[in-house]
Amino acid sequence: MDQIQVRQIHQVLLGCGFRYTNARDISPDSALRLLYSAAGFYVKSYLTSAGTFDVALVLKDEPFTTLPAAIILQSPEQLKGRLLPHINMGWYLCYVEEKEATWDPNDLEGLLRSVDIQIGLTLNNSVNAVETGLAVDAEMEGEFSSYWLARHTAYLVADVTQQKELNCFVAGTKNAHKTEYQEWVVCDDTTLEERDAWLSQRNLELHDSRGIITRRIRIKPSQLSGVTWPPKTFRAVLDWLAEVDNVAWLHLLEHFIQHPVKRHMILMDVLHQDMIGFRVDLDLGALALSSYQSSSVRRQRKAGRVNYAHLASAVSSKQAVQKFQRVNVVQADRLSVLSRNRRGKESGDLSTKHIALIGCGTIGGYLAGLLLRAGAGCGDKTFYLFDHDEFQPINFGRHVLATTDIGRNKAEALVSTLNSSTHLAKNIKAFTSRFAINAEQLKRYDIVIDATGRPPVSARLASVVRTFKLTERPVLIHGFNDGNGRASKVIIDDGRCCYGCLFANEAFYKDGMDLRFSHISMSAERHISCGSTFTPYDAAVSIITAGIMQEAALSVLEKNARWTYSEHMLEGGRTQKQKLLAAHPRCGICHGNL
């Protein structure tokens, strides 16, 4: 910031009621002093119904595009140590979602005044949520886990909602010379393969092959804000559960009766919040968990009821608890990872389909990664890639592969990249030969994706699938760059139309050429030599084509088709809207003339 801007900010903040405070007049033990080294800060007292909050602004080097941080120096005595919406760690005030917010960066005075108003509103909303308990803390939704302040992270490679027996494994860095790093992975018996892939790709190894028994507890809290948080002991966790959800409290205690072992990982699935967890190690010698009988045994033998209050006191006593650690929980299971970016999650992902990708050139290279991220090859169904060509230095400018792949078969290099990119990859395989276009081969797949850009291949695929019954056909998806890189075009052949139907429409095509490009000398732009043809254009059009082809593959999962033809024009005309392409009466493929 220059001096003019500094003076402008000074005058605006003083006008808003802030006072400039030297750093030496602020406690050196405060988070503000420990984290920020400025000579002074602007501080303002905000009055709420619960009392006064003193808030300091930390101005950034670029005040026009970056909002100042708001640090709470003092809060009302009755709220200290309490969980408050929008206040993290007891001192960091999240008064706006900066990444989602928009403002006029050229009006600095208006921006600072808006920040002042927003801080006041946020503090009042936070206090109001504590005092009234609004709708189980609507102000807290999505924030709760950030106040957990854990030192460790557990990654869930299993879908913990499936009620399977879970185990948590502790892993660390393989290189002994590196700073020791520890990571926890939760899986079940069906996801051990994903666990091993996770560890391998993150260069980790198990510290102990014995897992920590893990249990998910669902919590529907009566309130969140206003409680003492975060809990520093296991007893504090039990006290909190007893206060906000007695049923969850009982389920947790039953877990210890059913599993009288030393080490436990508990995942707390709080309604409308991200999951959090904790690890607790118990001294079994100080307890008598085996003397308690599970609820099912008690029903059968008609034994006396358990004194849960006594059990809670015993299991959380200082003598019983050897270790208590708060843990962040991150979902890394297939369902969570693959469905996150889909609007219609109910239709599933591509892991439920056998898929063949023919052609691993520029379009196929980008498309392969997109299909993987949509689930292809991540389940029991296969994702096979076909290409007979090798990756060469001249391919680098438009291809997703790297210099280390030069000389390798494109399909093999792509499969290596896909398998090493995620722990979810399971059934991905490369074939270094051309795809055999025959009935036996095509019947193996649910979706066959043609990324060759070669009309004879596309036309032959469309013809051969029409020898099948409609219910037995794979869906064909053709994608290609047209107009020497000026357009992306994608066709979905689900039986309504075919590749040939597009070019049979004489209103738009003549001799296989889009009439929008009729004024261009296509051959003059191509470099042709014996056995090869190269057309110079950048990778942008291929990336767009790959993106539309991914959309086409995902649309196959939907009950009702929205389109069978889509295009994007980069140059030479207007882009047509997506449409359901009808079978053309002059199409030789559909009418058996080929």
Protein language model features and the residues they cover:
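Compact alpha/beta protein-protein interaction domains typified by the UBC
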Residues: P28-V96, L108
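Glycine-rich phosphate-binding loop and adjoining beta1-alpha1-beta2 segment
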Residues: T382-H423
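A structured beta-alpha segment of the ubiquitous adenosine-cofactor-binding alpha/beta core
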Residues: A413-D446, T452-V457
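A short, basic/flexible loop-to-alpha-helix module at the beginning of a structural domain
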Residues: R326-I355, G377
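Glycine-centered motif in EGF-like
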Residues: E77-D137
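Glycine-rich adenosine-cofactor-binding loop
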Residues: E346-Q392
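Glycine-rich phosphate/adenylate-binding loop
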Residues: S126, S145-F324, A451-L594
